[in-house]
Every structure is written in C-alpha cells, then in structure tokens.
Amino acid sequence: MKAERLFRAIGLVDEGLIEAAAETPAKKRPVWRRYAAAAACLMVLCGAGAAYLVTGGFRGYGASAGGSGINNAGGAADAVTFMSYAGPVLPLTTAEENPGVTAERHTDWDFTPRTDPEGYDSQWGATVTDSYVLRNPTDTDVTLTLLYPIVGGIKDLLSIDPSVTVNGEKAETELVIGDYAGGFGGAGGGDTSTLNLRYPSQWTDYQALLDGGDYRETVTGTQIPADMPVTVYTFTDFEAPTEQYQAATQAVTFTTDETRTTVLSYGFEGYGWDERTGEITYSYFVPDGQRRSKICKKLIVIGADLTGYTLQGYRDGGCDPGEEIDGVSCTVTRSETTLHEVLLTLCREILDTMEENPGYYGWLSEAAEILNPETYCLLAERALEQYGLLSDKPVDRYDSGRLDELMDEVLSVDRVLYLKTEVTVPTGGTAEITAQYWKAPSFDFACSGSGRRNLQGYDLMTTLDSTLAFTAQTASVTHAENVQITGQNVGFDPENGVTEVKLDPNQPHYYLEIQPVPKETD
C-alpha cells in the first residue's frame, strides 16, 4: 500500500495525498556533514549598515511572569500568562568578556500611539529607549565592540526600526543574527514528535538560552559555506492540459539507496514512498499562471546520484493509478555543483520573487528589503545542520528534506538579533550609548475568550548575558496617560506622579502589564 503524505502546503494538495500510512517503518538516512566540520557551531555576521528589527505574531503559550516584587509592586503570583509571548527587553553587552568599564542604565517605555501604514493611530506596543552611561575607571582608553540584543524574527526587520547612538551621534551598525531561540515538540496529549515549532513562552526561556554567554559567543563567529558536492535536477518549461484538468500534476518517480543518498526538494507539493517497491515519488501541480504556486522546482541529491527516473502526468495531486493523463511535460536539467551554490541560487530566486510578488509571501516579503542572498543562504545551511538532514538527529518537521518550510521559517522564527558597533571610552571618562526601537507586546488572541483582549505585557531583563558591571538601573514610562497599568513589579504609579523608579540589578526580571485607555469619540 502506497504511503502518501501531505507536505505542509496547506490547502494546495488533493485529499488523496493526505497521510495514509502513519505506521510505516522509519527509513534510515545517512548523516551528511560539511567538510569543514568545525564551522558547524559558528554563526553568520551580516553586512554593515543600518538594521531594522521587529517582533510580533504568535510566540506560543507563555508567561510574562514576574520575579519578587519591589517598590510595593506586585510579585510573580500576580503576573498574567499570555498566549503569545514577545520576549523581553535585553541589556547591552560586549564581545569582550571583561570590558573593564562600569555602566548605568535607564530604560523607558513610551506609550505614544503609533501610526500604522494606513495612517491610523494604534495603541499597540511601545517605543523602548534603552540608555547607558559607560565609565572607564582605568588609566588607558578602552575600545569595545558593543552588541545590543533585540528579540525578533528576520521577517519583521522593517517594523522594529531600531537605532543606536554613541555620544549623541547615530552609529553605523552591523546586524548579527543568532540561532532560532526556541525548540520543537508535538501537539500535546502525549505526542512526542518534533513536528511543531515551540517558541520561547516566557522570560525564563530566554534566561536559559542566553545565560552563560554561549549563544552570544557563537553569534560572533564566522560560518564557512557548505562545500559538499551535490547533483541538482531543475524542472522548467511546464506544460499540461490545465483547461481540462485544473489540478494537473507532474510526478517524478525513482528509487535510491537511502543509506547512500539524501534528497532535498523545493517547490514540490507532494511526496510518496511505496514501502513494497521502495519507489519514491515527488509531485507538483503544473503551474498554470492562476494557482498560487512556486515556479522554482528543484531536487537536490546529496551522495550517490539517481540511476534514473520516470515522469508521469496525473489528473490531480493524488497521483492515483488509473488517473494518468497525457500532455503533461517539463524540461529537466541535471547539473553538478555544491550545496552552497545551489542554495545561494535558490535564495536569490526566493528574494527576487518576494520583491516581484510580495503578496505571495505576505509578511515574509519584508525580508527581501533587508536580507542579502549570501546571508540568507548561510542561515539556511545553518538550519539544515541544526535541524534538517545535515543534522545527526533531524527534527520531524524537516526530516522529509522539503526545503520550502525551512527556507520560510529561517525568515520567520524568533531569534536574538544583535546590533553591533564600536565605542572608545576614554580613560577616566564616559561614553553614552542609546538604543531605541519599537517593541511589540505579549498578548492573548482576541478570539480566545480569555477576557484579556486588550491586555499587553512587557518584560525587562536587568543583567542577562551582559558583560557590563552595572552600578545603577532605572526605568520610566512616558505618555502613561494613554494606558492603564494593570499589573507590574516595577513600582510605577503615574496617577500619583511616579513615572520613574529605581531598579535592583540583582533582580533578574521586571514585568509591566497595561491596557489602552479608551478614547472618547464624537
């Protein structure tokens, strides 16, 4: 019995492709590594220039839980658990482990309404201004590489719109991109699979991720491109009687020795494996200019090449016996290259498509305005090494070798993104550093019925993974008249004029929960 599975291309594939044999035995796969194995633990550094960052979207069920309360503020037991967690405001750090300077920090949440692209004012999120005074008590000047961390996904880079100033002058920065900040898991109820993304759900997840400095140290490394040889089959020049068969499908079938060959795919909607014959079938709806589908279609073979393949057209994506049709054709071009080169070509095509047809990719298309193909490619290679078929233990989400989801999620998953710049603190003197960006809140979904539809949550970490020695920290709220504070462990009391408070650097975490004040209407 043929085991067919539906790739995660929701709404695109015929019912005949839905999972029919979940109990089929697991297939053994070889583990493919880069020749430069030492590079596997290193990260990518983006090119110089101003960067743009944002958070937003579903973050997974989590908490904006507080630590011990001070300043007569609420404690952890009073904090709200949010359905979508946006991550905390993180402190400035340096690439140097012992920078030799002290720091005073002041963090402000500005609740001025934000004007959206349509011109409407929205009381959603806050502008964060995170300021530092660095003091050099030594008898020599100290030059530091500053790393300002922001939680976000690459797809959101335009909306956060951060800036860093040094001594009042806007600094040129490099964007340094960290790994995916979350993990993988099942759907609950005893499901032990790793099919689903599990975003960080509370501040302690970021504490576990960043504590000890390994994440930051990895970020500052350099990644070597994947130079392993591959054979690429590119499919073009599509033809089919789509007027008669609107879901006309092209299938390519072959057999491989799975201990010697691994196949990655892009642009294919269907996959099947016949456990009796060992035949593997990849299929795609023939592009007709009407259906939303990718034009770029590739099979990337790592290891032993295919010994042959057959092409067959079908009425629809089910690819069932008896539903073969004539008139379905394509051109298949075979080429030999490296994994890096084919992924780089794919990244160029994806980013070009995002620019030409942003509606197809939605919010992901914003990445095309920020990310260059070379950086995108290195991030995709890194994801393949960590979670895909270049990993010792691929997660279920990516173990099919389908690159479509992996390439999209490289752009969308939450990470810690660093703005990198340099500063010299003169002997006996100071340097002032200010980072500013828009911060999305944690929230509950409007349709959840939780009763917290308009509640917004914000978190702040005082010293997490910072190399700086803090001597003082304070926090403030600006334009607090626009919001009502419903929960906190900070100590703000705007109604009585308390809009700035001292923080305890020894307390790792502070939280703030607000609701917009309803506006009077005419």
Segments (PLM) and residue ranges:
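Disordered, charged N-terminal biogenesis/targeting segments of membrane/secreted proteins
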Residues: 1-29
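Generic structural microfeature
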Residues: 1, 5, 39-40, 127, ...
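Internal signal-anchor transmembrane helix that establishes type II topology
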Residues: 27-53
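Lumenal/extracellular ectodomains and adaptor appendage modules
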Residues: 53-522
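Secretory targeting signatures
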Residues: 16-23, 49-57
